[in-house]
């Protein structure tokens, strides 16, 4: 089991709930679209003030921080009723943010960030019985005016999925 630090997000950034194992059906992999941020920086940021957005986990090359309990609903995959996946919703998913780096206009991840995200993804898939095909990457970032690098730079969840299946995932 991974060592995961916890710092509760501000109450205005998520919705308290009592989701059970059967309620969580998707993992949504995002990235922060920052240059050199850390998991702890993100946990601190989401704890400070109400910004009406959040994720459950933040992953960098050194550690993983959780800011919303799995049973609660983080606001990470759609804004005010606008969703980009036919079935995945905030209420039935867990959001994982990978801390990114930037070289010119291209975002990338440190290799250890990818390894930690793979391990976290495997752990959550096993815990909630989530199949690999229900691990999603979004088509947009938090800032609507930015073209999400997951799509623009063709950074996808392939490397994370490969690591999941290599280590005995589903």
Which residues make up each language-model segment?
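Basic/polar, cationic surfaces and motifs that engage anionic cell-wall
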Residues: 1-8, 16, 21, 99-170
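N-terminal catalytic cores of peptidoglycan-degrading enzymes
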Residues: 1-89
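Short coil-to-beta-strand
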Residues: 87-98
């Amino acid at each position: 089991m991974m060592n995961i630090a916890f710092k509760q997000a501000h109450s205005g950034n998520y919705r308290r709930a009592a989701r059970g194992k059967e309620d969580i059906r998707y993992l949504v992999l995002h990235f922060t679209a920052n240059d050199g941020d850390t998991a702890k920086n993100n946990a601190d940021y989401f704890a400070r003030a109400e910004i009406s957005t959040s994720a459950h986990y933040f992953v960098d090359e050194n550690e993983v921080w959780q800011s919303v309990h799995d049973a609660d609903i983080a606001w990470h995959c759609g804004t005010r009723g606008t969703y980009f996946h036919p079935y995945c919703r905030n209420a039935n998913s867990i959001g994982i943010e990978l801390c990114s780096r930037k070289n010119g206009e291209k975002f990338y991840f440190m290799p250890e960030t990818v390894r930690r995200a793979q391990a976290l993804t495997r752990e959550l898939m096993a815990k909630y019985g989530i199949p690999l095909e229900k691990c999603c990457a979004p088509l947009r970032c938090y800032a609507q005016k930015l073209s999400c690098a997951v799509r623009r730079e063709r950074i996808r969840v392939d490397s994370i999925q490969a690591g999941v299946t290599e280590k005995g995932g589903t």
